[in-house]
């Protein structure tokens, strides 16, 4: 991605942040793909643009629930035209916020690490579930399963709600849980009407200068969520998905030890992943 005339202040698994001033930053979504907390060598073409469009759609759709990082400005307000033109579809002028130090994970269905946990313990992240549940089954109620926020290259660790309260304070933990569950519930209902089941998702929150909880980073994208096609959903299976699960499944079968460097992902797997991302965008946002 081309360099721009702003100072880079952070480079994450997928996003790069650039300083505009003490209140604003430019958030740029790259085409990088991370799986199992490792950044893969092979980018997914146009992925950053698709993620930005999906995120922006949800930020607007869910704005009645809570404030978000939008400033109301575009890249053309902060960059020269030649730079703005290159980045306009993958960059957002965002408020600078103090990140809440936990990942807010919400699950509506039993899958992934939650399914593995349930098979071993009958619980997901310490939350007891009914006996005899199957893979991909809808949970009796939506559950909040926070995790630590690891540095790039480290693994996030699931924690209990009590531990979450110890890290960020009980009152803030309760607010994060309530907002995350409401965001997921409303989004899942809408997505289902468009043919997508949102199995689970991860929200990121920050605090503004007044201490107001604010939704930030990315929202309900194929990178932060597990999206399933509703017409292929079947309890007791690992449903196909619209997200990077396609790459994750390929990596799982490759015999890779999940430590950097990752193996080279075949071109057809990359192409199918691009198609999945684009299909999710179309289903969610088309009129």
Swiss-Prot record:
Catalysed reactions listed for this entry: 5-amino-1-(5-phospho-D-ribosyl)imidazole-4-carboxylate + L-aspartate + ATP = (2S)-2-[5-amino-1-(5-phospho-beta-D-ribosyl)imidazole-4-carboxamido]succinate + ADP + phosphate + 2 H(+)
A Pfam family assignment: SAICAR_synt
Keywords annotated in UniProt: ATP-binding, Ligase, Nucleotide-binding, Purine biosynthesis
GO cellular component: cytoplasm
Pathway the protein takes part in: Purine metabolism; IMP biosynthesis via de novo pathway; 5-amino-1-(5-phospho-D-ribosyl)imidazole-4-carboxamide from 5-amino-1-(5-phospho-D-ribosyl)imidazole-4-carboxylate: step 1/2
Enzyme kind, highest EC tier: ligase
EC number per UniProt: 6.3.2.6
Keyword Isomerase belongs to the record: no
Alphabetized GO MF terms: ATP binding; phosphoribosylaminoimidazolesuccinocarboxamide synthase activity
GO biological process assignments: 'de novo' IMP biosynthetic process
HAMAP family in the record: SAICAR_synth
Similarity remark: Belongs to the SAICAR synthetase family.
Protein name: Phosphoribosylaminoimidazole-succinocarboxamide synthase
Biological source species: Neisseria meningitidis serogroup A / serotype 4A (strain DSM 15465 / Z2491)
């Amino acid at each position: 991605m081309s360099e721009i005339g702003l100072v880079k202040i952070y480079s994450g698994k997928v996003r790069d942040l650039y300083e505009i001033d003490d209140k604003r930053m430019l958030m740029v979504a790259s085409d990088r793909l991370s799986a199992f907390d490792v950044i893969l060598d092979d980018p997914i073409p146009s992925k950053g643009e698709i993620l930005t469009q999906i995120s922006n759609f949800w930020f607007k759709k869910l704005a009645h629930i809570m404030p978000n990082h939008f400033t109301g400005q575009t890249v053309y307000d902060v960059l020269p035209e030649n730079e703005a033109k290159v980045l306009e579809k993958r960059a957002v002028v965002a408020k600078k916020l103090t990140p809440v130090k936990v990942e807010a994970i919400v699950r509506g269905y039993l899958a992934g690490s939650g399914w593995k946990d349930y098979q071993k313990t009958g619980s997901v992240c310490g939350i007891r579930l009914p006996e005899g549940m199957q893979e991909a089954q809808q949970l009796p109620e939506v559950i909040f399963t926070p995790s630590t926020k690891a540095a790039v290259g480290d693994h996030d660790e699931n924690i209990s709600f009590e531990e979450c309260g110890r890290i960020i304070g009980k009152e803030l933990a309760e607010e994060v849980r309530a907002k995350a569950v409401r965001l997921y519930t409303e989004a899942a209902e809408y997505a289902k009407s468009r043919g997508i089941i949102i199995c689970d998702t991860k929200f990121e929150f920050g605090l503004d200068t007044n201490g107001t909880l604010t939704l930030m980073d990315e929202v309900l994208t194929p990178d932060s969520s597990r999206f399933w096609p509703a017409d292929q959903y079947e309890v007791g299976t690992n449903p196909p998905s619209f997200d990077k699960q396609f790459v994750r499944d390929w990596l799982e079968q490759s015999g890779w030890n999940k430590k950097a460097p990752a193996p080279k992902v075949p071109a057809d797997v990359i192409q199918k992943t691009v198609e999945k991302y684009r299909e999710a965008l179309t289903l969610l946002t088309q009129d």
